């Protein structure tokens, strides 16, 4: 374990003393540090009346137990504190460490020892080996009662809301939409979980089209074959219009007011929401239009879908109506809500957070968007090509519609609405235009970057630099496009398409607690969070701070001095093998074993580079045909320790999200020896070589220059590392699998790579 603490708010000695006293610790400024430490320890043994015995099980050095020490006349030393602190945090002497000073240095322990009250205060805010902060562990053990009132420590809400007395209710919010032309406004089902309390409380909202169920068989049947011919496109310039964000004016309902009349027992929850539920935040889960329990069509990513979620935030602020049932005869008021909302969730869920933020909806104070899509074109297309998300060849937006239109999982809904649904789905399948792979109005209507200037909320993004599902370009684009007037924060980790709130190496939960206590509970805690926090790829459990995602300097590296050719065509056996399992293709491609058609360029680095942003390939090429795909990958190649991209369990169910509530595993990315690491990649239709909206003809056997931007990353490269560039045509994981006989020739003498860095790195 190594500490990377971003959540602790520096506290003065007097403030620390008062907070400790407020928690019930019997400290006294007139007493010695030794006496105060003993009082602190005895009060911490919440489950034991025999505190002498508890003290006797701790040691203050390699030979002395704590009970003996406190009965002696020995002075308290720094070494004594180090032994005690480590044990309180769950580290075991003679197992985890023998030399506390060296161990504390190794784990980057953040606590200082100048003042006993400051020191104990900071210790309470530190995470233990199990992943829980010491204060959270003590509260769970009974330091404070679950009295359904707010209690704070170091600017963060504590788990003092009783999760055994939760209210679970369902309401149906009226939207301004009629997505299936039914003649009535669409309703969206809202599942609410909230503590029983006299306070008006803020809300953690997860907008999840998956939460009411998914239709795997329908999606599987809709999934496309990737084998086919790459189209030769007619030269043209694509034109699109950005539509203003409009909404109907709402009028107050005159219906009788009623409490919610529908309840539920269970819903798949997000554990970060659970963490905040025990700390006085309501949890709501909304699947939006076109899902089971709601009405309407699954419009998949456009602003109609976004508005169906926005309506829920408006209801929390008293602006729109929610009904007790589909009868629409009684309304429910969110009289428990303070009107302030934070949205959470990964992938599609985080995507809806981004979309909501771009509406500028009142009451949305914070989005915590993890692995979020910023424009749907970049999820299912790339540079004029159909480009499947990593791991899902053949998926497209209409396939996702089939997956998430869960109304068809309710038989009564199916027989009444399926004909209309199928007609709308067919329209969607035509609009996505798999034939050309081009950007069009349909995709433009699902591009949240067009409305990014409307964002008013505070923004937190997390993203994996090894996420080839929702690729890093999504967060790179949206983060750098956000208005300068807002506060924004970005956590970039070395994993794939995963959550990071339950990792050992970073206090993400506690950082969000400080931020949301500030923004949603109005606590003036002076919490400040860095703009870009990045997981160092060279060292285990180490996070660094940067000013920006994207460097201000470009380094240029030549690619060679010869001309090399890439064939597109494979023999039938190889083609069928790669179509059957794209992982076989990737393995052969990365090994460079002459089984795949590729140009491999090895670039031994002559100095250190902190790659920060989008690498670009500047290539001089010619093709033998009027169509061509160019694909590229950049690898850090050669044996050394690197991160795996999926976190593994450190301790099973050690993370407590309240008082023994919604426990989950503590995880971390393994750091082990490996042969290579993909840094970046990309695919390009050479007919879209100038920009996305310009389609150009290809003159066979005529040289032309292209600039090819690859996926952004932050990656530390060292002198002597081998940067491997692979150029090829068809990518069997992502692109159309056209086995036509064409070739691309690259003049390496006229080609180079630019690496974005920060000046001075």
UniProtKB/Swiss-Prot annotation:
Active site positions, chain numbering: 347 (charge relay system), 467 (charge relay system), 497 (charge relay system)
Function: Removes N-terminal dipeptides sequentially from polypeptides having unsubstituted N-termini provided that the penultimate residue is proline.
Protein name: Xaa-Pro dipeptidyl-peptidase
Enzyme class per UniProt: hydrolase
GO molecular function terms attached to this record: aminopeptidase activity; dipeptidyl-peptidase activity; serine-type peptidase activity
Subcellular location per the Swiss-Prot or TrEMBL entry: Cytoplasm
InterPro entries listed in its UniProt record: AB_hydrolase_fold, Galactose-bd-like_sf, Pept_S15_Xpro, PepX_N_dom, PepX_N_dom_sf, Xaa-Pro-like_dom, Xaa-Pro_dipept_C, Xaa-Pro_dipeptidyl-ppase/CocE
E.C. number(s) listed in UniProt: 3.4.14.11
Domain of life of the organism encoding this protein: Bacteria
Principal subcellular localisation of the protein: cytoplasm
Pfam families for the chain: Peptidase_S15, PepX_C, PepX_N
């Amino acid at each position: 374990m190594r500490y990377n603490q971003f959540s602790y708010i520096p506290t003065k000695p007097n403030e620390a003393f008062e907070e400790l006293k407020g928690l019930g610790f019997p400290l006294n400024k007139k007493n010695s540090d030794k006496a105060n430490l003993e009082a602190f320890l005895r009060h911490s043994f919440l489950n034991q009346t025999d505190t002498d015995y508890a003290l006797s099980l701790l040691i203050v050095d390699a030979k002395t137990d704590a009970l003996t020490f406190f009965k002696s006349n020995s002075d308290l030393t720094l070494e004594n504190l180090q032994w005690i602190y480590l044990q309180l945090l769950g580290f075991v002497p003679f197992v985890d460490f023998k030399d506390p000073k060296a161990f504390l240095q190794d784990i980057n322990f953040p606590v200082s020892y100048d003042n006993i009250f400051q020191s104990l205060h900071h210790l309470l805010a530190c995470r233990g080996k199990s992943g829980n902060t010491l204060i959270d562990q003590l509260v769970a053990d009974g330091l404070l009662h679950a009295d359904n009132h707010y209690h704070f420590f170091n600017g963060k809400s504590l788990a003092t809301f009783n999760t055994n007395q939760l209210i679970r209710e369902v309401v149906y919010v009226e939207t301004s939409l009629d997505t299936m032309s039914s003649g009535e406004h669409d309703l969206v089902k809202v599942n609410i979980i909230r503590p029983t309390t006299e306070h008006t409380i803020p809300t953690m909202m997860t907008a999840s089209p998956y939460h009411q169920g998914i239709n795997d068989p329908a999606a599987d049947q809709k999934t496309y074959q990737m084998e086919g011919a790459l189209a030769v496109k007619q030269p043209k310039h694509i034109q699109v219009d950005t539509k203003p964000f409009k909404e109907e004016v709402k009028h107050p309902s005159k219906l009788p007011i009623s409490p919610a009349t529908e309840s539920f027992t269970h819903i798949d929850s997000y554990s970060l929401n659970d963490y905040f539920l025990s700390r006085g935040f309501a949890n709501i889960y909304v699947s939006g239009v076109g899902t089971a329990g709601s009405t309407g069509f699954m419009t998949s990513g456009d602003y109609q879908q976004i508005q169906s979620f926005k309506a829920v935030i408006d209801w929390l602020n008293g602006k729109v109506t929610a009904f007790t049932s589909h009868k629409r005869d009684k309304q429910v008021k969110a009289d428990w809500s303070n009107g302030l909302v934070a949205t959470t969730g990964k992938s599609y869920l985080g995507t809806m957070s981004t979309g909501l933020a771009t509406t500028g909806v009142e009451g949305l104070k914070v989005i915590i968007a993890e692995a979020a899509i910023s424009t749907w074109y970049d999820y299912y297309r790339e540079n004029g090509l159909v480009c499947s998300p990593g791991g899902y060849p053949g998926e497209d937006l209409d396939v996702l519609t089939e997956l998430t239109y869960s109304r068809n999982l309710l038989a009564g809904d199916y027989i009444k609405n399926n004909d209309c649904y199928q007609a709308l789905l067919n329209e969607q399948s035509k609009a996505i235009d798999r034939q050309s792979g081009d950007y069009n109005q349909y995709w433009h209507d699902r591009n949240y970057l067009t409305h990014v200037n409307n964002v008013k909320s505070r923004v937190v993004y997390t993203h994996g630099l090894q996420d080839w599902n929702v690729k890093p370009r999504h967060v790179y684009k949206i983060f750098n496009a956000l208005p300068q007037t807002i506060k924004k924060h970005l956590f970039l980790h070395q994993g794939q398409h995963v959550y990071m709130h339950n990792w050992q190496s970073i206090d993400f939960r506690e950082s969000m607690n400080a931020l949301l206590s500030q923004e949603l509970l109005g606590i003036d805690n002076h919490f400040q969070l860095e703009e870009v926090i990045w997981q160092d790829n060279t060292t285990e459990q180490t996070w660094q701070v940067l000013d920006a995602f994207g460097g201000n300097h470009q380094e240029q590296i030549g690619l060679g001095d010869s001309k090399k050719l890439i064939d597109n065509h494979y023999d039938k056996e190889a083609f069928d093998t790669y179509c059957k399992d794209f992982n076989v293709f990737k393995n052969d491609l990365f090994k460079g074993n002459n089984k795949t058609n590729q140009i491999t360029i090895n670039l031994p680095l002559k100095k250190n580079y902190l790659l920060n942003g989008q690498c670009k390939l500047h290539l001089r090429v010619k093709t033998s045909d009027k169509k061509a795909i160019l694909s590229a990958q950049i690898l850090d190649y050669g044996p050394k320790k690197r991160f795996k991209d999926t976190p593994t369990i450190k301790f099973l169910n050690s993370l407590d999200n309240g008082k023994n509530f919604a426990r989950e595993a503590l995880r971390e990315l393994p750091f082990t020896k490996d042969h290579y690491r993909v840094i970046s990649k990309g695919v390009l239709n050479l007919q879209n070589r100038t920009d996305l909206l310009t389609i150009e003809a290809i003159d066979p056997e005529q040289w032309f220059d292209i600039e090819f931007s690859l996926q952004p990353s932050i990656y530390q490269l060292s002198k002597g590392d081998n940067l491997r560039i692979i150029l090829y045509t068809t990518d069997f994981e992502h692109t159309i699998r056209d086995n036509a006989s064409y070739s691309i020739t690259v003049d390496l003498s006229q080609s180079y790579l630019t690496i974005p860095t920060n000046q001075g790195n």
